[in-house]
A protein has these predicted regions:
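Amphipathic alpha-helical coiled-coil segments
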Residues: 21-25, 60-92
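Extended alpha-helical coiled-coil "stalk/arm" regions
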Residues: 28-57
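Short intrinsically disordered terminal tails
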Residues: 1-5, 9, 89-96
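Short, charge/polar-rich alpha-helical segments
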Residues: 2-33, 69
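Alpha-helical interaction segments
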Residues: 15, 32, 58, 74-75
Length: 96
């Protein structure tokens, strides 16, 4: 084997090493891009779930507000009924 053959072999080995390194670099870039996409999708999913939870929370809150509003309405009705009942009792007492 001549020195030239040895150098040619070394150059070929270096080319292969560079090709492998470039492939690993490209694979790493692809993995990074894939990871970024995965993180984004996960963050979006978490956001959606959180948003869904918030929607559920607001739905429950709306029901609670409706329940409260109905309770206030019925309290007002009962208070008016009691006022009328009391007025009627007072009228009957003064008339009778």
């Amino acid at each position: 084997m001549t020195m030239l053959n040895t150098l040619e072999n070394l150059v070929e080995l270096q080319k292969e090493t560079v090709k492998k390194a470039l492939k690993r670099r490209d694979d790493a870039k692809a993995k990074i891009d894939e990871s970024k996409k995965s993180i984004f999708e996960f963050a979006k999913a978490v956001h959606d779930v959180k948003e869904g939870d918030m929607d559920t929370l607001f739905t429950v809150l709306d029901f609670r507000i409706d329940d409260y509003a109905n309770a206030v309405k019925w309290l007002a009705i009962e208070e008016r009924t009691l006022e009328r009942y009391t007025e009627r009792l007072l009228q009957e007492k003064t008339n009778g």
